[in-house]
Amino acid sequence: MSINKNIRFLLEKLLNSYRETKLSYLNSADSHYHPSFNRFFNHQAIIRNNMFFTVSNILSEIGIEVGDVILKRPDIKQFMSTKIEREKKDLFFKNLKKDIELKEILLKLIKIDSEKNRTDTYKKHLKKISESIKANKSYSLGVKEKMFLNN
């Protein structure tokens, strides 16, 4: 099955981004001690995992081997900066940035992919990501307010 190279590139990027954000949310859950925040982070990781498998199915349907697409080696710079980044920014903000990147990829895919089943999937993912962005913003503001009040 032939597919536009831009769509293929964006799908591959989306797949790796879902994997990365899932891991980011799991890291955030491990780093946070507030139960409601842990639930939120773990729930978001599950959502990203489901989205990852949906996109991997799309890639398989169009004849792309998913194993060839997934970035095998972790980004050393990312691992090294994780602790530093946690100290500088709250975890909600960090995940918010990643979700905004996902939203941009999904919007591009909706714009250029004309296959209805795939665009419906992108729209469902976009809705979930948009909800997550709102929640991350809300939690981030709450965390910043608590930090401000405690100082």
Where on the chain are the PLM-derived regions?
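Terminal, compositionally biased segments
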Residues: 1-5, 57, 127, 131-134, ...
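Alpha-helical bundle segments that constitute or directly flank the non-heme di-iron/ferroxidase center
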Residues: 1-32, 88-113, 131, 135
